[in-house]
Amino acid sequence: MTLYLDGETLTIEDIKSFLQQQSKIEIIDDALERVKKSRAVVERIIENEETVYGITTGFGLFSDVRIDPTQYNELQVNLIRSHACGLGEPFSKEVALVMMILRLNTLLKGHSGATLELVRQLQFFINERIIPIIPQQGSLGASGDLAPLSHLALALIGEGKVLYRGEEKDSDDVLRELNRQPLNLQAKEGLALINGTQAMTAQGVISYIEAEDLGYQSEWIAALTHQSLNGIIDAYRHDVHAVRNFQEQINVAARMRDWLEGSTLTTRQSEIRVQDAYTLRCIPQIHGASFQVFNYVKQQLEFEMNAANDNPLIFEEANETFVISGGNFHGQPIAFALDHLKLGVSELANVSERRLERLVNPQLNGDLPAFLSPEPGLQSGAMIMQYAAASLVSENKTLAHPASVDSITSSANQEDHVSMGTTAARHGYQIIENARRVLAIECVIALQAAELKGVEGLSPKTRRKYDEFRSIVPSITHDRQFHKDIEAVAQYLKQSIYQTTACH
């Protein structure tokens, strides 16, 4: 598959397909023409010695300092080196790759003044899977993701560290191996690379992809639990949900009916009890609300994926060109969205933990043994799996605190409000990892509960899932190191998203 970039129409589904199919990037001709035109404006500014931020002046508080024309290119290299202050563990390979795609896409809008050489260097790195090593910490998410994107830019100019074919190497060594020259930054280009929200947005895209998938995975896991507890099917009737009008809720109810169709373990209203606890009865309402959040996040991310978020921006209108210093680099819209994503995923984990508690609690699980123990008393069974899930959901509650309500001044109070969007993105992904493990715990426990109930009573669709996951997690016949089962299921759930990724 080839992914064609035009600066205007990139979608999350495009990114997902790109990651799964080891695609290549191509650039449409119209986008290249826009790049040429915007670069011509920069060249005229240089020729006329105009005063334009970041081209002929310094940065931040130094915006009033005029730069000698012989030092314009040096200014850009100095910018990248000094701003590469990222710290901590690196972003994943997928996030770093998507970061390059998004930065390339925004340059193709033709408002940044980049050269074709810069555009082609980004394309080369993407297609050759030369992955910059980009530390996660250090961005305030307001004057762009300056630190992370500077580490990306370092790789392009042959000064950074990269992953190439599974090995960490110096970028310069990889370029030499591939007979490729490091990028020689021209006026404006350092700024064009690092003024933007691509770190938070790239992590947000990966988080959205995995969060949406978790939402779907949580439904069949919940369906296993529902059957193991002889849950009441009536609560999922279409007419119940149609009168509330939330389409996502209606959709979840329909999928739950589909997962449970043909089961002999489900019950009807008043058959053994009048109504179920909320964690079973309200799955469409709870999960549906998470999908509402995911839809909002997707919309915001796709706007930003195709946005010009550089500064300054170059425009042409009625044969007139002008350069405007604005603030499109400010990450507030994405920070808000990613804080919402944290809430949506946290609730999937919260309700999952409460469901699995019902499976192991002898006061709530009907005729199932306490903690599903094969020999209660001598063997603890699933007791501490519930502890682990409780720990993870409690950690998520702390991580879900909104990063976007925080701000701190920087650059001598010139940049006096920041979004903290990249912090929201990082915390959001940790919540996703935690939530996946909570769902893995529910899966391990629900598999055992279904076995004790009699798998012949499962619906055909959930029986297939039971058989699939029993190949990963064997029956619990005695106490064992359950952390291995949990991690194996969590990894399998994640791999189902990225069957073949472009980075491996």
From Swiss-Prot:
Gene3D superfamilies found in the cross-reference section: Fumarase/aspartase (Central domain) (1.20.200.10), Fumarase/aspartase (N-terminal domain) (1.10.275.10)
InterPro entries the UniProt entry points to: Aromatic_Lyase, Fumarase/histidase_N, HutH, L-Aspartase-like, Phe/His_NH3-lyase_AS
Gene Ontology BP annotations: L-histidine catabolic process; L-histidine catabolic process to glutamate and formamide; L-histidine catabolic process to glutamate and formate
Any single GO CC term annotated in Swiss-Prot or TrEMBL for this entry: cytoplasm
EC number(s) given by UniProt: 4.3.1.3
Pathway this chain belongs to: Amino-acid degradation; L-histidine degradation into L-glutamate; N-formimidoyl-L-glutamate from L-histidine: step 1/3
Keywords: Cytoplasm, Histidine metabolism, Lyase
Covalent cross-link (5-imidazolinone (Ala-Gly)), residues: A142-G144
Reaction(s) the record says it catalyses: L-histidine = trans-urocanate + NH4(+)
Residues bearing the modification 2,3-didehydroalanine (Ser): S143
Post-translational modification: Contains an active site 4-methylidene-imidazol-5-one (MIO), which is formed autocatalytically by cyclization and dehydration of residues Ala-Ser-Gly.
Pfam families: Lyase_aromatic
Enzyme class: lyase
Cell compartments where the protein resides: Cytoplasm
GO molecular function: histidine ammonia-lyase activity
Residue ranges crossing the lipid bilayer per the database entry: none
SUPFAM superfamilies recorded: L-aspartase-like
The family this protein is said to belong to: Belongs to the PAL/histidase family.
Protein's name according to its UniProt entry: Histidine ammonia-lyase
Gene: hutH
